[in-house]
From Swiss-Prot:
InterPro entries: Cortactin-Actin_Reg. One of its GO terms (biological process) is neural fold bending. The modification N-acetylalanine is found at residue 2. Residues 254-293, 707-720, 929-938 have a biased composition (Basic and acidic residues). Keywords: Acetylation, Actin-binding, Cell junction, Cell projection, Centromere, Chromosome, Coiled coil, Cytoplasm, Cytoskeleton, Microtubule, Nucleus, Phosphoprotein, Tight junction. Residues 11-354 form a coiled coil. It comes from the Eukaryota. PANTHER family: FILAMIN/GPBP-INTERACTING PROTEIN, LEUCINE ZIPPER PROTEIN 1. This is Leucine zipper protein 1. It comes from Rattus norvegicus. It is found in: Cytoplasm, Cytoskeleton, Microtubule organizing center, Centrosome; Cytoplasm, Cytoskeleton, Cilium basal body; Midbody; Chromosome, Centromere.
Amino acid sequence: MADIANYKDAASNRHLRFKLQSLSRRLDELEEATKNLQKAEDELLDLQDKVIQAEGSNSSMLAEIEVLRQRVLKIEGKDEEIKRAEDLCHTMKEKLEEEENLTRELKSEIDRLQKRMADLEKLEEALSRSKNECSQLCLSLNEERNLTKKISSELEMLRVKVKELESSEDRLEKTEQSLVSELEKLKSLTLSFVNERKYLNEKEKENEKLIKELTQKLEQNKKINRDHMRNASTFLERNDLRIEDGISSTLPSKESRRKGSLDYLKQVENETRDKSENEKNRNQEDNKVKDLNQEIEKLKTQIKHFESLEEELKKMRAKNNDLQDNYLTELNKNRSLASQLEEVKLQVKKQKELGNGDIEGEDAFLLGRGRHERTKLKGHGGEVSVSKHTSREQSPQHKRERLRNRGFALNDEHCSLSNKQVSSPAFTNKRAAKASNMGVGPDSGTQETKRTEDRLAPGSSQSEGKKGREQPSVLSRYPPAAQDHTKVWRGNPKPGTESGLKGKVEKTTRTFSDSAHGSVPNDVVGKGDKTSDFSSEAHCGKRGQVPGHASQVTQVAESGCSKAIGALASSQRASSEGLSKGKKAANGLETDANFPHSKAPILSKYPYSSRSQENILQGFSVPNKEGVDHSVAVVMEDSSQHEALRCRVIKSSGREKPDSDDDLDIESLVTAKLVNTTITPEPEPKLQPNSREKVKSRGGTRTPLFENDKNAAVENDSAKSMRSSSNAVEFPDANCAGVKNQRPFSPREALRSRAIIKPVIIDKDVKKIMGGSGTEVVLEKQKSTPKSVTSKVTSSITIYPSDSSGPRAVPTEAPRERHTSTSNIQVGPPELTSVSNHISSPLELSIHKHDITLQLTEAERVGDGSPKNRAETVVSRSSILIKPSDSVERNSHAFPAETIRWKSHSTSSEVASSDTRHITVRNAWKSKRDLKCSEDPPTRIGRNVEATNAYTQRSSTDFLELEQPRSHPPEQGTRKVGNSGDAPELSSRRTQSSLTASEVLTRRNRIGDAVTAASWNHSSNVVSLTFLPSALICLTEDLGNTEGWEMLNLR
């Protein structure tokens, strides 16, 4: 116990000791602590002091300290949060790492998947394409199925058709056999036609040979009869021998039809051959079907053709029968004509014995009858053939031969008795048609034939009767040149679209042109006409004619000219018999009564013949106040000579009555030994009321064309002409009334139309006229110029054909001479050979010198200002071409430019040929006119002046201009001729036609060089006067200039 107690005590002691130590240590620490505290308290006190001191200034610091304390406290609290956050961050890092590993794995998977997707897309596209293709294939399969069904059905149908075609083939074979038999029949018919055609051609050749022989005989008779035929003109003027062509014109139509049938048969044969070949080549069913269808169609067409051919054959047979009947009647007529020709020959022998007796007139009268009958025959049959021969006849050689043959045939007909029978009127018609075809194109020929056929029915007989009258027997007029004239009488008709009108005109033209020109082709005549037309147109325009009317005027004028031709022929005959007989115009009137039908076509043919023609017509006709027809009968006679120029020209305004072409023809009657063409450049105060009234009654309707100046002028002209001819013969108004107004004509037709005024016999003393005939022609031209000027001078140029002496220069002899020169006044637009539509109608105007002088004196009496004006009115310029028959051959070749030449009368041909001076007028003239002389037969004396239609007016003005500068020196000569006791002015104006050829040539030499195109500006009318008997005078008037005569050789 005590130990435990001790022990305890010891333990307690120890413990106490530790406590004491610890306490002592603690006390030490506390002491240190107290010391530190004390220091700290000191420092705090110091700080407090400082703080207290600084509190005033640093209160904000205290606030900040407090804030900082608070922040420290917060930071301490945040530290804990940061620790927590750190823990969280660690955890997050771990998670992120895990996620990154996952994402990597996912990316690799995505790449794999994308590649697979691309592959899948490609597969899908391929699938879609395949689907579309499948759908299309399905559609196409369906379509093919449908097609196969259709094809199968079609095959079945085709099989059925093939069977049918096989059956039809059998039928077709049978029909082919029948067709072959028919073809053989047709071939036999065509062979017979060909043989007939050969036979007819041979016959024609024989006839042509006979005609040539007859023409030679006639030429021999001409030389013997020239001197004896001068006095026959008075009687012959009554009698126109017109030998009309026969039915031969219808033959060419037959031949053409035969040709067409032959061609058709050939075509049929070719088709049959093709058929057989096709049948052989057929191997497949489809080809067979096609071939069979084609063959069936061909066979049908062939059957139709055969039917049409059969109808044509029937028609042709009927026509052939008619033609044969007509041919027989014409043969009978030809025989009667042959007997008449024998009688005429006997009378010609008597005339030779008697010399210049009156028997010639009787002979001419008989000849005229023969011609009348022939013309009547000719009218119906002749014109039909014209169109058909056109194609053959258009070669220049053929044309020449035709013209020659025609001329020979006409000569033979006049001279030979039985020989005329050889050349039937039908045959001559063929020639005339061919000749006309030469001048005209084939087209115009066909047109003309159509028109002629249409118009022939009403007016052919009348025109023929008139034609007979219009053709004065040329033999009596111009013993030397008579045959030539007769030749041209027939040759002029031109087939063409206008044949109806033109055929009639051609008839009249034939009568005049043939008598005047011998074998002058229509174109030749047309050329002269055209030249006159140009000048006349230019004059008309200058005279103030309305251009619109100009064409109509030309038409009317031309128709009037053609009428005047017939009228002249008839009137000349009548006048040759005497004025008392001249009033016999009843003959002319009778023919004229026929004229309305026959001549109206002429007017229509020459709707625009030319103003010069109109002027001539106007000169002949005064405006009808009655308005019946524009026909004006101007009767011009030399009172002393009893030479009545009765120019009845119907100037119907084409505008008023287009349909009355035929009627117009009636009035174109010129009965006068002389045709006095009066030019009325100045108004003449003096007019005979009687003559005016006469003229007015006939030409009143014509006034609308030239109502202002021309009416007065026409009245003056007619009055003068009436005054000049005391024995003026009035045409019965019945003819005028019978004449219908022409339909208006287009300028184109006017250009186509030509009126040729051909020779008329003048009864004046040959001696008188030999001296001074030139002025008469000039005056005639003036007449032809429009009546715009009242002062008229009518000039008649009579050149006696038989008078061989080249110089008839003595003007003093003029009053005595009964110079029968036919003036070929060609009035009409120029005619080109190429222009098919042109037809020239010859008008024969023979102007009596006394008529010219009378009217000149009247003009002077009237007191027309200065005598020079009268003279100018007579002929300001005239180109006279006196061309001996010998020179006709020269016309065969055309010169590039017109040459103006003077030639002496028939005997003066030698002098003329040597002396003739060629003056090229101007190149434009050439271009304006195609001068066709190549076609002229040597016998042809007429002048051919052709010009293109476009240049008609210009050419006329040019022609006048050429003449104007030359006109002054010849003017004196012309006045001398006119001076036949009437006026000194006329005496001073002796025309150069009366001058010897040498004188004319000298004047030409002086004047010709002065010719310039500028001089052509004067208003003037050109009238080409052709003196056919031995010379051709182209007379051109240029108003406003002194008269001048020039030989104008237009080739």
